[in-house]
Amino acid sequence: MIKKIIYLAFLLPLAGNAQTTVIKPLVKQPTAFAIITDNQTYANTKDAMHQYKTAVEDDGLATYLISGDWQNPDQVKQIIIKTYQECPSLEGLVLIGDVPVALVRNAQHMTTAFKMNEKAFPWDQSSVPTDRFYDDLNLKFEFIRQDSVNHQHFYYKLTEDSPQRLNPTFYSARIKYPEKKEGDKYAAIASYLKKAAAAKADKHNQLDRVFSFNGASYNSDCLIVWMDDEKAYMENFPLAFGRQMGFKHWNFRMKHPMKYKLFSELQRKDLDLFMFHEHGMPTGQLINDELACTDFNNRYKMLKSTLYNAVMSHVGKRDKDTLRIQMQEKRQVNEVFFKDLDNPKFWEADSLHYADERIVTEDLMKRNLSTNPKMIMFDACYNGSFHENDYIAGQYIFNDGQTLVAQGNTRNVLQDRWTIEMIGLLSHGVRAGQYNKLIASLEGHLFGDPTFRFAPIEANTLSTDITIHKDDKAYWKNLLNSPYADVQSLAMRMLADADTQKELSPLLLKKYRESGFNTIRM
C-alpha cells in the first residue's frame, strides 16, 4: 500500500555556498528517482516541475525534487551522493535546465570510438562531455579547471586509481533546451514537463509500432547487415511483427532524397519507437549519399559539383582564378567546364541538392516539425551534443509533438557494433533509463524523461526488480526460462554481474549454446 509521508523541504549549505532545496517524496515506493534542476529553472517552471514529480510518483517511483544555485559539478554530485545514502533504492535521476557539464579527460578508453590527442587539440574538442560524472559513483575524478568561455563547462581528469570500466550506479537523462532554438526556454521546458506528465496517464500503450532507418554509409552500406537486423528485431518487438505495418525497415537506397518521406513518418501519431541508424554531427543527420552515377549526365553533374566546391573551399587563402587554372590542369578539363563557377543559379541548385541529403536542426525549426514517436534513437556521432547551443536530439523533444525521450551521443561513436543490444526490454515495461544504463558508454546519453516506459507484453515487475533484486541470483535464474529473448538476456546479464566468483560460467555457456534466440547468442 502506498503510504503518505510528510511533505518536507529543507535547505542545505553546500560547498561554494550553494543554497539547495530538497523536496522529499510524498509517497513511499520500493524504488526512487531524483529530479535535479537549477534554482532559476525551478522558479520559472515550478508548477510544471511539480506536475512531473507527481506523475512520476504515481508511476511507481518515490521522487525527490532538488534545486540549487550550482557553481560546479561537484556540488551537484555531493547532493546526489547524499540522496543515495539516504535512499539506497534510488534508481535514476534527470538533470533539468542549467546543470553544470563535466568534460572528462584521460578516459577515452571508455568511449566506443572517440580518440583525440589531448595534448595537441583544444580542451573543448579533446574532452568528453559526460554525465557518467553524476551517475557512476564508482569512478574517481580530479578537478582541473573551469572553461574560460563557457562557465557551465568544467574539466575533470579520470584518476589512475579509479575503476577503468563503466558501471553506472543509476540511470540519468538531460532535459536541456537548445539555446539556438530561441524563444522562452523556461516556457519550453515547462511545456515538455507537462507533456511528459500527461503521457504517464496512458497505461496501455504497448510497443507495437516501430520504424528503423539505415542512412548512407552506415555499417559500410552493407545490405546483408541491414537485412539480418530484422532477425533481432523480430525478437525485440514481437507485438510489432504481429500486426500489419507494425514494423517498417527502410534503407536510404529506397529514395533520393529520403528526408521528406522520413518527415512524414516522424509525424505519425501511432508510432512508438523510431530508430535512426546513420552518421551525424551536432546539428545534422546524414540521410542520403550521392546518387549512383548510372549515365554520363549524372557523372558530369557530380564531377562539376566536386571540383567547383574544391576550388571555392580554398578561396580566401588563394586567388580564385589561380585555383581554377590549377584545377583545370590537374583534372584535365577545359575552361568551359568552369563557366558556371560564378553563376548564382548553379550554387543555388547545388546547395539544395546537398541540403536534400541531410536533416539539420534548421529543417526542424523552419518547418516547426512536430515529431510523434514516443522514443527516438540516434546512434550517430554527435547527435546528442547537449553541451552545444544546438543539438539534434534536443530539437526532437522540444516541439509540439509527442516525443518524450531521445538517445544520442556527445562524441563520435562506433557504428560497427550491436547498437540495438537489450532494446527489446522496452517491450516488457522496462524504463528507458534502465535500458540505457545497461548499454552505457562515456558519450551515450538520454534526453527527456528517463522514467518513460511502454506497457509490457505481459504484466510483470521487471522495472522494480532490476533494482531491488539486483544481486538475487535465484530470481534471475528463474527468468532464464522466460519465453522472451530480451528477458532471458537481462537475466544472463544480471547473473554475470552478480557472479563475482565466476561460478555461473557453465550455466551461462549452456544457455548460450542451446538457446534458439539470435539475440541470446549475441
Role assignments for model-derived ranges:
Residues 19-522:
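Cysteine-dependent hydrolase recognition
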Residues 1-20:
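Bacterial Sec-dependent N-terminal signal peptides
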